[in-house]
Amino acid sequence: MMTLTFASPPQNKSDLETGPAFTPRFDEKGLITAVVTDAGDGALLMVAHMNAEALALTLETGVAHYYSRSRRRLWKKGESSGNVQAVREIRTDCDQDAIWLKVSVAGHDATCHTGRRSCFYRTVGVDEGQAKLVITDDERHFDLKQVYAES
């Protein structure tokens, strides 16, 4: 249960950018963007969204929680796969409308639901005038059918 609450962002830009208060600026849907990297090697793992409850639970428990826009519900990362994200550090950007989580991933060391370490396993390029995707990391860290059989 969430006990932590967040004050409204200050009107003064200087206070927002240099003051000591963490006052996240949630968007009109009540969400803030979360960029997630590996605390050890800095690899980009995923981008997700948090509502106030997910952010508070993350701060209170030290385990990453997010808000699923497609499922419209709170979820603890790794609750199905076992790839729980232990939060090592949280940073916010200058105007507090995005956060950066540095995490250690338990389980299979995979963040993506496809079984890959990162959700960013494809590059975007142009081939014969068409935008194309190229898979650059096809290593699966777990068997999807086995891990998600009960989900």
Curated annotation (Swiss-Prot):
Q: Where is the composition biased (Polar residues)?
A: 1-13
**Reactions performed catalytically:** 1-(5-phospho-beta-D-ribosyl)-5'-AMP + H2O = 1-(5-phospho-beta-D-ribosyl)-5-[(5-phospho-beta-D-ribosylamino)methylideneamino]imidazole-4-carboxamide
Subcellular localization: Cytoplasm
Instruction: Recite the UniProt cofactor note for this protein.
Output: Binds 1 Mg(2+) ion per subunit. Binds 1 zinc ion per subunit.
* Any single GO BP term: L-histidine biosynthetic process
Q: What is its EC number?
A: 3.5.4.19
**Ligase found in the keyword field:** no
Task: Check the record and name the SUPFAM superfamilies matching this protein.
Answer: HisI-like
Residues covered by region (Disordered)? 1-20
Where is Zn(2+) bound in this sequence? C94, C112, C119
Keyword annotations: Amino-acid biosynthesis, Cytoplasm, Histidine biosynthesis, Hydrolase, Magnesium, Metal-binding, Zinc
GO molecular function terms here? magnesium ion binding; phosphoribosyl-AMP cyclohydrolase activity; zinc ion binding
- Where is it predominantly found? cytoplasm
Q: Which pathway, metabolic or otherwise, does it act in?
A: Amino-acid biosynthesis; L-histidine biosynthesis; L-histidine from 5-phospho-alpha-D-ribose 1-diphosphate: step 3/9
Identify the InterPro entries for this entry: PRA-CH, PRib_AMP_CycHydrolase_dom, PRib_AMP_CycHydrolase_sf
Cofactor(s), names only, from the UniProt record = Mg(2+); Zn(2+)
Top EC group = hydrolase
Any one annotated GO CC term = cytoplasm
Q: Does the keyword Hydrolase apply?
A: yes
| One family name in Pfam for this protein | PRA-CH
- State what this protein does: Catalyzes the hydrolysis of the adenine ring of phosphoribosyl-AMP.
By sequence similarity, the record places it as follows: Belongs to the PRA-CH family.
Q: Which PANTHER family match?
A: HISTIDINE BIOSYNTHESIS BIFUNCTIONAL PROTEIN, HISTIDINE BIOSYNTHESIS BIFUNCTIONAL PROTEIN HIS7
Q: What is this protein called?
A: Phosphoribosyl-AMP cyclohydrolase
- Organism whose genome encodes this protein: Sinorhizobium medicae (strain WSM419)
Q: Which gene encodes it?
A: hisI
